[in-house]
């Protein structure tokens, strides 16, 4: 348990909020809106958060757990945040330096694979294939994270 608490302790409250918004920025990048989410997309996002909670990496799990613990409040707060997706994901990327290279890569993989790809596939054909638009949006978001994570092939 101490390892998980140690992850959060590395960040200020403002930095932690930025990390909590990471899944929201990835979701927004795929669905193309910052607020007033389509309820079907939002339900998929919630399922992807649940799946992400089992991802490897203590930081990712702790961030996702904290998001799920106050999802409604964070959703409202995210809707009022003025940062763009690009600025937000860039800030997430910069903050991950504090977590170490391995933990940072696991966090980025969680954002891209569990959240981004999860939402994109659910929105696509048969709930399994990403549309070309969603795949392009996801690729751009992954680049904003300076991610070394590769998108899974359809």
What label would you give each PLM region?
Residues 1-154:
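Small-residue-enriched hydrophobic alpha-helices in membranes
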């Amino acid at each position: 348990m101490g390892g998980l608490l140690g992850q959060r302790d590395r960040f200020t409250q403002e930095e932690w909020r930025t990390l909590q918004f990471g899944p929201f920025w990835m979701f927004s990048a795929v669905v193309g809106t910052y607020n007033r989410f389509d309820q079907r997309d939002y339900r998929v996002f919630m399922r992807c958060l649940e799946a992400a909670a089992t991802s490897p990496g203590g930081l990712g799990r702790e961030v996702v757990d904290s998001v799920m613990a106050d999802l409604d409040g964070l959703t409202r707060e995210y809707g009022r945040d003025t940062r763009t997706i690009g600025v937000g994901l860039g800030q997430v990327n910069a903050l991950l330096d504090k977590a170490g290279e391995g933990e940072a890569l696991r966090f980025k993989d969680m954002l891209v694979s569990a959240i981004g790809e999860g939402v994109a596939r659910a929105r696509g054909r048969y709930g399994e294939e990403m549309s070309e638009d969603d795949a392009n949006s996801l690729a751009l978001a992954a680049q904003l994270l300076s991610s070394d994570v590769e998108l899974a092939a359809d």
